[in-house]
Amino acid sequence: MAARGECRRAGQDSEPEPEREPESEPGPEPEPQAGLESGEAFEIVDRSQLPSPGELRSASRPRVADSWSAPILTLARRATGNLSASCGSALRAAAGLGDGGGGGERAASKGQMMEERANLMHMMKLSIKVLLQSALSLGRSLDADYAPLQQFFVVMEHCLKHGLKVKKSFIGQNKSFFGPLELVEKLCPEASDIATSVRNLPELKTAVGRGRAWLYLALMQKKLADYLKVLIDNKQLLSEFYEPEALMMEEEGMVIVGLLVGLNVLDANLCLKGEDLDSQVGVIDFSLCLKDAQDLDSGREHERITDVLDQKNYVEELNRHLSCTVGDLQTKIDGLEKTNSKLQEELSAATDRICSLQKEQQQLREQNEVIRERSEKSVEITKQDTKVELETYKQTRQGLDEMYSDVWKQLKEEKKVRLELEKELELQIGMKTEMEIAMKLLEKDTHEKQDTLVALRQQLEEVKAINLQMFHKVQSAESSLQQKNEAIASFEGKTTQVMSSMKQMEERLQQAERARQAAEERSHKLQQELSGRGSALQLQLSQLRDQCSGLEKELKSEKEQRQALQRELQREKDTSCLLQTELQQVEGLKKELRELQDEKAELRKVCEEQEQALQEMGLHLSQSKLKMEDIKEVNKALKGHTWLKDDEATHCKQCEKDFSISRRKHHCRNCGHIFCNTCSSNELALPSYPKPVRVCDSCHTLLLQRCSSTAS
């Protein structure tokens, strides 16, 4: 197993190195696939030119005889062995092409593809490790002429060409890795800028040059790993360009994507020259695998020194940021003290204003009480006046009721008299036949009675008109005086009863006229019989005339009573007008009371707003004190944090799962401990970093709570 290589950088993610794999035992060399072109994945190198493992051991010093256990040399030995085996098998396959059957060729091609994938994986790990180590020692900004960077692009190009299908066209066969890279534009819209800029370069004439330019631009954007991950996730589209056993179609592709994430710490400034990109020949440099143990020891010491320097730089940056934060906090404290003094002055002014407003409020209350007492007195006086008027009105109404009862009794008596007269008329009709002269007199008397009846009818109509006028006047009095509605309603009911009784009397008079007509008809028949009874009838007629005169006198008295009632109604109207004026005065007093109440409510609102402002000022002061205490606690906590080394962590601190190739190490920028990707996937902006950085779950929740408390 190859030991895990380490690459550290203060303030950046730590990249795990692959564990050592068991060395492949030498077996039967697989035959190459028929039609395989030489130099498809690698250039063929003469095996005799490569140093053997024995020569390497003899070349090294005696004290480092066991140095092959080191990670770089072990990987170099495996890479040289695999490459030499693949080259030898390719030469033998070229010599004995066509000897094996179809099944043997497939098995040999699969074995060869597996060996090539393993070799490319080891070379990719070595190139990335050497690139990161050299970049961290010299500086993280790289140019296009940097040898480890060029070697990385060569290995990356071989990885993308591995297992690539050959496309036939009219011109000939075309085999370029720019075709799969064009798919990234469809899968990830962010890569459209790279594709368009590569197509618009006029100096690029070949597809290989465009593919290399695409890799340069993706590395400069620090999104090479993201784009390749999107491409590998869509293997159905990749199957159109790659064989099933290709490196991009197997698990090694995801491992390479994980290794490429570590290159995001580097800043590359690459120049895109079309001639250089089109004419470059991708040759893998195996001199990286031939470092001695002394360089390895010096590399370890250099790594330790860089770790110590990174820790020192981290602590210095922390102290610098803490000093900056302390200065900012001191300025904030000064500003808060100034604002506190201003707020205290405003508070004293507000208290003076409140005292003056309270005095004004007390004066307004006293004025309000005086006005209220006056209004209450005026209301009581008006109530007493209305009570007296109501009592007088009730008394007048009782008198009217008594008068109406007397009139009703008189009408009943008249009805009785009329009934008696009808009876007497019947008797007289029986006696009218005695004398014609008496009948003439009776006719004259009847004409006179008709005249009197007409006069009585006219008087009744006048009484009706008067009653209607009274009714309308009572309705107007009801609208002005609501308290007298019930009395007027009862009065109207009684008037309607009188009207109904008058109508009944008219109907009875009509019946009497009809009876009189019948009596006249009978009188014609009984003229002979009434001739002897004329004197008696004259006496009776005189009596009837006396009764009619008495009825006329009673009607005159009723008219006088009606006139008296009209006068009383006029007086009541005058009193109602006076009451309306008094009610208007009361309404004016009510409006003044409402205005005073509104002013009082506005003053209360002003007082409440000033009290709320004072409360808010107190809350702001308490919150500023709490913020100061929180900032002091944060400074204390930051001073106690230490940056944990990669060697000291073998498992995640939160989920306690062991780290591996797929589960990488990540530092929390707040507490300095190491976590896996799932436990430290959150990003927050810290005061010591200009951009959002990786933070563990516990620190994420704690920082969010602090932010929410400060925001509230």
From Swiss-Prot:
Location of region: Disordered: 1-45, 498-532
Stored InterPro entries: FYVE_RUFY1 (IPR047331), RUFY1-3 (IPR047335), Run_dom (IPR004012), Run_dom_sf (IPR037213), RUN_RUFY1 (IPR047330), Znf_FYVE (IPR000306), Znf_FYVE-rel (IPR017455), Znf_FYVE_PHD (IPR011011)
Signal peptide annotation: none
Gene Ontology terms for molecular function: lipid binding; protein-macromolecule adaptor activity; SH2 domain binding; SH3 domain binding; zinc ion binding
Binding-site residues, Zn(2+) 2: 668, 671, 696, 699
Main location: membrane
Keyword terms: Coiled coil, Endocytosis, Endosome, Lipid-binding, Membrane, Metal-binding, Phosphoprotein, Protein transport, Transport, Zinc, Zinc-finger
Regions of compositional bias (Basic and acidic residues) in chain numbering: 1-23, 504-527
Stretch list, region Interaction with RAB4: 619-629
Zn finger spans (FYVE-type): 646-704
Entry comment describing in which tissues the protein is expressed: Broadly expressed. Highly expressed in oocytes.
PTM per Swiss-Prot/TrEMBL: Phosphorylation on Tyr-393 and/or Tyr-404 is required for interaction with BMX and endosomal targeting.
Coiled coil: 325-378, 409-621
Residues bearing PTM Phosphoserine: 624
Residue(s) carrying Phosphotyrosine: 393, 404
Membrane topology per record: Peripheral membrane protein
Domain annotation RUN: ranges: 143-275
Binding site for Zn(2+) 1: 652, 655, 676, 679
SUPFAM superfamilies, sorted: FYVE/PHD zinc finger, RUN domain-like
GO annotation terms (biological process): early endosome to Golgi transport; endocytosis; endosomal vesicle fusion; protein transport; regulation of endocytosis; small GTPase-mediated signal transduction
Subcellular location, record wording: Early endosome membrane
Described function: Activating adapter involved in cargo sorting from early/recycling endosomes. Regulates retrieval of proteins from endosomes to the trans-Golgi network through interaction with the dynein-dynactin complex. Dual effector of RAB4B and RAB14, mediates a cooperative interaction allowing endosomal tethering and fusion. Binds phospholipid vesicles containing phosphatidylinositol 3-phosphate and participates in early endosomal trafficking.
Entry domain remark: The FYVE-type zinc finger domain mediates interactions with phosphatidylinositol 3-phosphate in membranes of early endosomes and penetrates bilayers. The FYVE domain insertion into PtdIns(3)P-enriched membranes is substantially increased in acidic conditions. The 2 coiled coil domains mediate the interaction with the dynein-dynactin complex, the RUN domain is also involved in the interaction. The coiled coil domains also mediate self-association.
Subunit structure: Self-assembles through coiled coil domains to drive ELVA (endo-lysosomal vesicular assembly) formation. Interacts with BMX. May interact with SSB. Interacts with RAB4 and RAB5 that have been activated by GTP-binding. Interacts WITH RAB14 and RAB4B (GTP-bound form); the interactions allow endosomal tethering and fusion. Interacts with ARL8B (GTP-bound form); the interaction is required for RUFY1 endosomal location and promotes interaction with RAB14.
Designated name of the protein: RUN and FYVE domain-containing protein 1
Encoding gene (name): Rufy1
